[in-house]
């Protein structure tokens, strides 16, 4: 097969060399974006008088035909045509004849592929934002159902203070909200057009870059043609944002895995999101949560892979940039899948309120309450801290908990202790009292839920 760029060459490459250099096996995912970009480009060429209206109309009819074929998965791509751009151009010329060769006037594959990826990521980032909002809605529903479900809060994976389960869930809501904000902000840099930058230096044809950008829904154009064809910051930013999102999902999955274990028994996964063992019939494994945790690593890898590709590239385009796509495609697929699984997993899990309640009555997570009790009576907090530390030591030696210590023993430690101390030791009361802004107090959770619901409703409207 003769190449569309073959005029300079006297020998054809070996088949295995062609296969090594071809990208059609993966960049065919850009087929819709490539055709839509071409439709906008030829429309602009006609407006500027670079091609005739009749030629443009014939080209657009051919492109529309290919677009419909693509939507029905009827296009057949070839390695010999290398990439999505030359495959489409070859098919177009087979369909409408030599006039199809005018499509590439005033354009290079360098600005063409960059345009395709901007269009692709714009669409996918908007989808991901919607998927995050759906997950946030699930979190809000779970939080609403568990405002007064008391559980241990942890530091160093040691029981620290009693908190509301709703408060714990909403922590992830706000992590995800930051992820949404980052993705939304990245759209400012994704939604600009490199089309018309040419190979690197622009073009001698009197093109109208702003017009083609407007046709494609971009908010503006790259100001520098070298930057336009060599920039992959927008992909790196997407991979970085996705890495942070996956880190948040992975942290939550780690907790779900722990909570579903026999050692915790705080939650039970739905059978839909768990698997069994081929040898141990009693097992119910949290495989979906483990997979999300594991897939986080591949998204990190995609980010570092492209950073490494980019770090030594001189301006402008280099073939190394062919390596920018597979990690991007893989990350989109991974993130979309993980968000979908995460939402279903959280929506269908069963919360074991009784086990959570037992965990905060058979521990020392109420120790801070006693220290605060003494501090509220005028004792310096550091002295109160030391007294309570001795009380905890006394309890561990006796095999009892703070609620079991008689008042007389408390009074031996400090005359400030009174009968009302035992009200303070209630985990429910401890949670209720923590009513500072952003705290686990029930009033604060209600306020947080109102804000969270407002954000999810606003997203649904948009």
Curated annotation (Swiss-Prot):
Pfam families: ASL_C2, Lyase_1. The gene is argH-2. One of its GO terms (biological process) is L-arginine biosynthetic process. InterPro entries: Arg_succ_lyase_C, Argininosuccinate_lyase, Fumarase/histidase_N, Fumarate_lyase_CS, Fumarate_lyase_fam, Fumarate_lyase_N, L-Aspartase-like. It comes from Bacillus anthracis. Belongs to the lyase 1 family. Argininosuccinate lyase subfamily. This is Argininosuccinate lyase. GO terms for cellular component: cytosol. It is an enzyme of class 4 (lyase).
């Amino acid at each position: 097969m003769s190449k569309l760029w073959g005029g300079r060459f006297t020998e054809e490459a070996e088949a295995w060399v062609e296969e090594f250099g071809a990208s059609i096996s993966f960049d065919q995912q850009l087929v819709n974006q490539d055709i839509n970009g071409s439709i906008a480009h030829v429309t602009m060429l006609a407006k500027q008088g670079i091609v005739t209206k009749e030629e443009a109309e014939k080209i657009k009819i051919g492109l529309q035909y290919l677009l419909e074929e693509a939507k029905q998965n009827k296009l057949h791509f070839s390695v010999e045509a290398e990439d999505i751009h030359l495959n489409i151009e070859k098919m177009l010329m087979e369909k409408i004849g030599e006039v199809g060769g005018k499509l590439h006037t005033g354009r290079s594959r360098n600005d063409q592929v960059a345009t395709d990826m901007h269009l692709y990521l714009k669409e996918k980032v908007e989808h991901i934002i919607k998927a995050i909002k759906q997950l946030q809605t699930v979190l809000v529903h779970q939080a609403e159902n568990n405002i007064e479900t008391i559980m241990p809060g942890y530091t160093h994976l040691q029981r620290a203070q009693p908190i509301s389960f709703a408060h714990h869930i909403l922590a992830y809501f706000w992590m995800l909200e930051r992820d949404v904000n980052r993705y939304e902000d990245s759209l400012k840099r994704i939604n600009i057009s490199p089309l018309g930058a040419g190979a690197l230096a622009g073009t001698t044809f009197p093109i109208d870059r702003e017009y083609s950008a407007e046709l494609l829904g971009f908010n503006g154009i790259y100001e520098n043609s070298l930057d336009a064809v060599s920039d992959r910051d927008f992909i790196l930013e997407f991979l970085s944002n996705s890495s942070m999102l996956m880190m948040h999902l992975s942290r939550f999955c780690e907790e779900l895995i722990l909570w579903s274990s026999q050692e915790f028994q705080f939650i039970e996964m739905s059978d839909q999101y768990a698997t069994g063992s081929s040898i141990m019939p009693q097992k119910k494994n949290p495989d979906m949560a483990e997979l999300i945790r594991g897939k986080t690593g591949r998204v990190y890898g995609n980010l570092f892979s492209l950073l490494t590709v980019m770090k030594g590239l001189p301006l402008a385009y280099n073939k190394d940039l062919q390596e920018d796509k597979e990690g991007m495609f893989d990350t989109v697929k991974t993130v979309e899948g993980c968000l979908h699984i995460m939402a279903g997993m959280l929506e269908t899990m069963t919360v074991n309120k009784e086990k959570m309640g037992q965990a905060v009555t058979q521990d020392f997570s109420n120790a801070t309450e006693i220290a605060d009790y003494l501090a509220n009576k005028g004792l310096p907090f550091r002295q109160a801290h030391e007294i309570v530390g001795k009380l905890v030591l006394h309890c561990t030696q006796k095999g009892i908990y703070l609620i079991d210590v008689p008042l007389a023993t408390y009074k031996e430690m400090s005359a400030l202790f009174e009968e009302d101390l035992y009200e303070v030791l209630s985990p429910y009361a401890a949670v209720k009292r923590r009513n500072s802004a952003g705290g686990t107090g029930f009033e604060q959770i209600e306020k947080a839920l109102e804000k969270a619901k407002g954000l999810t409703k606003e997203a649904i409207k948009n």
